[in-house]
Amino acid sequence: MDKIIKSIAQSGAFRAYVLDSTETVALAQEKHNTLSSSTVALGRTLIANQILAANQKGDSKITVKVIGDSSFGHIISVADTKGHVKGYIQNTGVDIKKTATGEVLVGPFMGNGHFVTIIDYGTGNPYTSTTPLITGEIGEDFAYYLTESEQTPSAIGLNVLLDENDKVKVAGGFMVQVLPGASEEEIARYEKRLQEMPAISHLLASKNHVEALLEAIYGDEPYKRLSEEPLSFQCDCSRERFEAALMTLPKADLQAMIDEDKGAEIVCQFCGTKYQFNESDLEALINDKA
């Protein structure tokens, strides 16, 4: 089962989140039938949103949009504070071969664009923030958002490793943030440790990558585990929700679906589930609108 572990240095100088998101990203790949580069780009976005959602309280809903002008198009993810996330990528078929070290390229195929976050607190006034894409690698763009919009300097590592068949082998990441009150000495020590950390891909390849991430982040520094919470890919779409959407259409449009298509098929963008509405279903909707 996927999970996020929240921890804090015993000194109170900084905190860290580490994630195992392997099942989340594997299910996203299965549902959207994404090829290699598209899988990694979507996976990193899902992991970023899992981190962002874990930082919120209450019943907030968090939307992350990575909007680029190159091959991937837009990547959209929605998460809640209960560990659920869903998402999709416009172009599922980007399949750029790995580098000599086995890395899948993402940044060059994201292009120029924006990292957009929308946090809905359920009060009717969602908070929206837009920052430019810095590298298109998702992790660096997420870190820049946290620094610029939330005024919280953060170190971020996100990645998805694929097997020889381009299926998800492991996915996960981390976030480290300096906390108010940290001394200059503590900040310097934290920065030095992060600079000396192995690459995220190397840590994810470890037998127990969650523990490897924690060890790399804290080293010999004592820390406390605050919580361990489950994560999953879960879509909240339903037939009732799409039926309500059909009800917003004019009668003429519903009648056209009956006359021309003998019904309607609606496919959820986030999970690919198909909902069928036959002629009788559409006629009932027309009658309900009368």
UniProtKB/Swiss-Prot annotation:
Record's keyword terms, sorted: Chaperone, Cytoplasm, Disulfide bond, Redox-active center, Zinc
| PTMs per UniProt | Under oxidizing conditions two disulfide bonds are formed involving the reactive cysteines. Under reducing conditions zinc is bound to the reactive cysteines and the protein is inactive.
Which SUPFAM superfamilies does the record match to this protein?
Hsp33 domain, HSP33 redox switch-like
Disulfide connectivity? Answer: C235-C237, C268-C271
InterPro entries tied to this protein: Heat_shock_Hsp33, Heat_shock_Hsp33_C, Heat_shock_Hsp33_N
Q: Name one GO molecular function term.
A: unfolded protein binding
Family according to the record: Belongs to the HSP33 family.
Q: Which PANTHER family match?
A: 33 KDA CHAPERONIN
What name does this protein carry?
33 kDa chaperonin
Protein source organism = Streptococcus pyogenes serotype M3 (strain ATCC BAA-595 / MGAS315)
